Curated annotation (Swiss-Prot):
Its EC number is 3.1.3.8. PROSITE patterns: HIS_ACID_PHOSPHAT_1. Catalyzes the hydrolysis of inorganic orthophosphate from phytate. The active site is at residue 17. It comes from the Eukaryota. InterPro entries: Acid_Pase_AS (IPR033379), His_PPase_superfam (IPR029033). Transmembrane segments: none annotated. It catalyses: 1D-myo-inositol hexakisphosphate + H2O = 1D-myo-inositol 1,2,4,5,6-pentakisphosphate + phosphate. This is 3-phytase B. The gene is phyB. Belongs to the histidine acid phosphatase family. The keyword Ion transport does not apply.
Length: 28
């Protein structure tokens, strides 16, 4: 398996989580 694909998958998951659960430091 390509390590790059794993990294991309993690980034996508993080982005999704950020959208669903925005960090308190986001501003709102």
């Amino acid at each position: 398996r390509d390590p790059t694909g794993c990294e991309v998958d993690q980034v996508i998951m993080v982005k999704r989580h950020g959208e669903r659960y925005p960090s308190p430091s986001a501003g709102k």
